[in-house]
Each structure stands twice: as structure tokens, then as C-alpha cells.
């Protein structure tokens, strides 16, 4: 019989228990003459990423090879491309509630990450993980991501009066780009974009939402406002093509420092999976590439290790050096 106690398929809303899974396996083997087919299996993993990870963690040759399993197939966003953080929160809640029902401790594995946030533990998802990890006998393990060698992060320290530039290569056939700039609220930093044709667009860093237009591209900016739990401000920049694609070439993100008290800033692109193969920073920073929610305070962040070279994998997401 299966060691899977439950499957929750968020894409359909269906939930399966051990009895129904065992029954499916029995009927399927009877009809196929012993050859098992996964085509219509409950909560079938079409991507196979979750299956591969669970095999390492709890497969017959895995680490916890006798452990029971509660599996969640995550739902997707409206455009059906990437999971939503709310889906992940629902999945964690489901697993822990089931563990409470079975009166068993539980290790929750999350092999998911994104770049949206200040990477300081203060997003809703990170706070949720911190809180729910204290609610029961559980440990939450989160992969640190695969972004360290993908050139999706640029950051540093800027002092009063300095100008620093991030060079962003935009490949052909790039449909849209989201750029996040995070800085301390009390630092005054002006931002200017320069497109590959040399046109300069000064970004207004006051107000809320602003719109600009440059060659074949509409630019929408959203400025974050103070909150009780976050000392960082987001300057969100969305590049949207007027036709099919953004103007390819080197875009410059120019930071011009006014009054500076801290000076630390970070710029993130979306996950490399959401970008074209040639879209990346020319002068990236590998530190700070750990993905959210591995940045939560009460989780175990897990990197990737290369056993052949006895070192961490080049792609393994990294935290900050401070």
C-alpha cells in the first residue's frame, strides 16, 4: 500500500486520502495487467519537480524512506504560469492541519521561490511561515533557489552625491520586465532609465503610480509607502512593449544619491524562468540571490551541493554576506 496519506490537488480542488489512492493503484494494475500508468493518477505531477524532490526526501531510497507523505499539487496564477503565494500558504496550512489530525510531527518541504520582496523576512508569506512554524511540532525546509548564476540581482552601497549604474541586457523577444529597486526609506535616491537608443527617462520617486513612454515601451512605476514592519521602500518599474517586444539591447538603471544615511540598495529581476535567455544584468551580484520564502526567519534554508567538486553548486541561491 502507499505511504501517501493525502493528496490535495489545488488545480482541481480535489482531495484524496490513502484509501482512494490505494484503490486507484489496485484498479489500475488490474486493468493494465500489472503495468502502472500515471496518466490519470490522483494529483499527477506533470512537471515532475515535486516528484523528484519528494523521492530524495522520502522515496524508497531517500532520506526518510519509511515516512508517511502528505502531498499538495500547487495551483497557479490567473495566467496559469506560476504558483501564487496564497496557494503556497494554503498548502502549508493543509499539511500542518493534517499532521495535527494524525497527531504526528511533520517536516514541510518547499521547493519553490520567487524574487518579489526585500528579502528581509517581512513579506506576508515569510511572516506566515514564521508564525505557523510555531503552531505545531513541525519544521519547514525551503530551497534557497537556483538564481545565483542567473544574473538577476544587482546591489551595493551608495554614498551621498554618488552615481551608480546597473547595466541590464534585454534580449530579443522579451515581452515584459518587472524591476524592483529596494532602498531604505530615509535615503534619497533618484532613478533614471536610459534605453538602448540613449533616451533618458527620469523616474519620479514621489507619489504613488506614474506612467512614462519611450521608444516602443510603456513604463509604469509604483512607489512603496511606509509600513510599521518594513524600513525599506520599493521602487517598482514595469517595462511593457507597445507592440510585441521590449527594445532589445543595453538598458541602464542609473541611481543618483542625494541625502544618504544607510546607502544599501538592491535591484532584482523576476525569476530567470520568467525571463528570456539573454535578459540579465551585465554586472550582477551573486550575494542576495536566495529566493523568497527561504528568507523567512523560522525556516531551514537549503542550498545545493555539488558532490563531485565538494563545494556548493554555482546556481545555488546565496544570502547576503552580512
Predicted feature residues:
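Sec-exported extracytoplasmic/periplasmic mature domains
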Residues: 58-59, 93-100, 130, 134
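Short acidic, glycine-rich surface-loop motifs adjacent to enzyme active sites
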Residues: 73-74, 92-120, 143-144, 255-258
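Short acidic, glycine/serine/threonine-rich loops at helix termini
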Residues: 80-81, 119-122, 151-156, 265-267
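Catalytic cores of secreted or luminal carbohydrate-active enzymes
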Residues: 108, 125-159
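Edge beta-strands of jelly-roll/beta-sandwich modules across compartments, strongly enriched
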Residues: 260-271
Amino acid at each position: 500500500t502507499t505511504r501517501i496519506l493525502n493528496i490535495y490537488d489545488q488545480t482541481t480542488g480535489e482531495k484524496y486520502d490513502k484509501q482512494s489512492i490505494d484503490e486507484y493503484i489496485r484498479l489500475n494494475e488490474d486493468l493494465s495487467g500489472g503495468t502502472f500508468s500515471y496518466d490519470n493518477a490522483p494529483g499527477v505531477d506533470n512537471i515532475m519537480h515535486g516528484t523528484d524532490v519528494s523521492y530524495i526526501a522520502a522515496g524508497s531510497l531517500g532520506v526518510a524512506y519509511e515516512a508517511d507523505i502528505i502531498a499538495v499539487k500547487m495551483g497557479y496564477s490567473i495566467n496559469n504560469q506560476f504558483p501564487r503565494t496564497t496557494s503556497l500558504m494554503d498548502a502549508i496550512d493543509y499539511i500542518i492541519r493534517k499532521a495535527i489530525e494524525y497527531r504526528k510531527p511533520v517536516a514541510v518541504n518547499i521547493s519553490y521561490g520567487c524574487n518579489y520582496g526585500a528579502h528581509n523576512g517581512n513579506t506576508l508569506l515569510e511572516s506566515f511561515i514564521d508564525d505557523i512554524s510555531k503552531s505545531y511540532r513541525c519544521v519547514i525546509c525551503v530551497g534557497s533557489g537556483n538564481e545565483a548564476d542567473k544574473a538577476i540581482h544587482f546591489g551595493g552601497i551608495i554614498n551621498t552625491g554618488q552615481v551608480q549604474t546597473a547595466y541590464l541586457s534585454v534580449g530579443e523577444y522579451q515581452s515584459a520586465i518587472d524591476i524592483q529597486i529596494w532602498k531604505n526609506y530615509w535615503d534619497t535616491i533618484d532613478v533614471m532609465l536610459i534605453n538602448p537608443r540613449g533616451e533618458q527617462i527620469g523616474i519620479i520617486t514621489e507619489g504613488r503610480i506614474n506612467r512614462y513612454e519611450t521608444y516602443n515601451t510603456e513604463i509604469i512605476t509604483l512607489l512603496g509607502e511606509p509600513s510599521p514592519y518594513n524600513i525599506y521602500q520599493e521602487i517598482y518599474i514595469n517595462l511593457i512593449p507597445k507592440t510585441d517586444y521590449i527594445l532589445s539591447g543595453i538598458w541602464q538603471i542609473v541611481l543618483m544619491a542625494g541625502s544618504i544615511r544607510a546607502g544599501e540598495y538592491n535591484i532584482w529581476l523576476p525569476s530567470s524562468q520568467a525571463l528570456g535567455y539573454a535578459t540579465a544584468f551585465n554586472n550582477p551580484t551573486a550575494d542576495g540571490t536566495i529566493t523568497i520564502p527561504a528568507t523567512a526567519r523560522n525556516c531551514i534554508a537549503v542550498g545545493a551541493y555539488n558532490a563531485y567538486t565538494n563545494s556548493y553548486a554555482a546556481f545555488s541561491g546565496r544570502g547576503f554576506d552580512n
